[in-house]
Amino acid sequence: MTEKLFYTDSHLQEFTAEVVSCRPCDNGYEAVLSRTAFFPEGGGQAADTGVIDGIRVYDVQEKGEQIFHYLEGELEEGKTVTGQIDWDKRFSRMQQHSGEHIVSGIVHARFGYDNVGFHLNDELCTLDLSGPLTKEELREVENAANEAVFANVPVQISYPSKEKLKTLDYRSKIEIDGQVRIVTIPGYDVCACCAPHVYFIGEIGLIKLVQSQNYKGGIRITMLCGRRALKDYQQKEESVKAIMGSLSAKEELIAEAVERVKEECTQLKSELAETRYQILEAQAEKIPEGQKKVCIFDSKLSGNEPRELMNLVLKKGTEVCAVFAGNEESGYRYVIGSETEDVRPYSKILKEQFDGRGGGKPVMVQGSVNGSEEAIRKVFE
């Protein structure tokens, strides 16, 4: 049985232990120590990483009563070794996990919803709640969670007897066999949990609910705590200041300024589209009435403009109109249409002679092709 030092002291960063066993595995070596401060994956939290005698530990898993450390190199059995966990990573995870307990406890107490899902990685922490919350209710929960941090109450760990457990009102997502570890944040939450937590709630720092979405009849919340919340604030502050500078707007007026720019952009896009269509009309006007076949090459056409130009030309009585956008270096996008004949044979020829791609219906085909303008024009002569 591996002694779990991460339960004895969640802030223990370095420890010594005896190597019980070390065997080769798929991606290195699998070692069991007499005791460990490395937390194995569990309870929605990833495993600790670090080093043992300078050898990298990339994963930790618990199997039965033993904890297996997965290393990039071999350890000598029977030797006393020194382990060091990646503390910044562990502390960040404890900040998130303890913060999640506070948020879940507050939601359960105020709205009666359960935490039905939890995931914690090195970027985000998400929790799934069994019922919906409005924007105002989320802000209420966030404010209450930070008030809890300010109170800086100690986190209490206990292992109640089965008799005591029956009388205890605690949160738990699953039925637990054997000894149950209870994490209590006085006044805010009582929950069964296997993960290490901070000593005092004040260590969590800022709790910020950054995103929410409807999920399986409830809500999924993305939250950041401590250093992660600080980093997020700093990044957003930089973005806000950049927008303020670009729009020459005060901080409290940037949303209004962005909306104004958005409206102006929409108007300009509309005016540009109208102008571009007028250019297409002028371009089509230059085509003689009733010309049987028209082949147009224009590198400036974009989006749906080739098709629009084709339709304008066909309205002039042209039997077949082919429009190519692009250039010889990067290739051409094309559209070919007719109101009087099947244009699919043209697409077939382009495929065969110019390694083209495309297809469509008898009245219109479109695709891409590589070749010279001169050679492609001969197809329509």
Predicted stretch roles:
Residues 1-381:
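A glycine- and charged-residue-rich anion-binding loop/surface
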